[in-house]
Each structure stands twice: as C-alpha cells, then as structure tokens.
Amino acid sequence: MKNFIGGEWVESKGELVDIVNPANQKVIGKVPMSTKDELNAAVDAAREAFPSWRRTPPLSRVRVLFRLKELMEEHFEELSRIQTVEHGKTIDESRGETRRGIENVEVATDVL
C-alpha cells in the first residue's frame, strides 16, 4: 500500500504491520506504518493544495464529491466486506456504515 502525497503514489519506508481481523484474530494482510517524515510530507502537500481547492468553484467541488458518491455506490458491497473483515463487524453493520458514508457525501454536496 502506498501513500498519496502531493498528487502521487509514494512507497512508504515504514515497517510493515499486520492487519488483524478482530472477529477471529487472523492476519489478513500487512500495511506499512508511515513514517513521521511521510506524514509531515502529506500534511505539507495538503496545506499547499488547499488554496487552490478553496478557489475551486462550488459546482466543480460538487462534481468531485458526486463522483466520490458514485464510486462508493458502485463499490458498496466491496467497501462493506472490507469493513467487516478489518473491523470484525457483521455485514449488516458494515452495510449500514457504508450507507451512512454515502449519505455524508450527499450532505456535503448539498452544503456546497
């Protein structure tokens, strides 16, 4: 898994840590623990990008968020399954949480 920093996917130099399914304690994968420098680079890139996003017209922002909503809906079951495995939730709980995430994006598009 890579970090997305400054518009680019960057390989992490951090050590790999286990992803454990809390429902059965099985290791389901590994992810790098990003370093402090990587975190700082991501924060710096976000701060640098903010003025441009701030000047982005509301309609353009809504289009970006609407695309996010579409992608979340297209991958609804996959997102729900990932939550179930990574958080030990039932699939129904995960589906509810995924649906709430989609609703939050919908609210954000209405606010803009």
Predicted regions mapped to residue ranges:
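Terminal low-complexity tails and localization/encapsulation signals of metabolic enzymes
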Residues: 1-30, 63, 67
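Glycine-rich loop-to-alpha-helix module at the N-terminal edge of alpha/beta enzyme cores
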Residues: 28-112
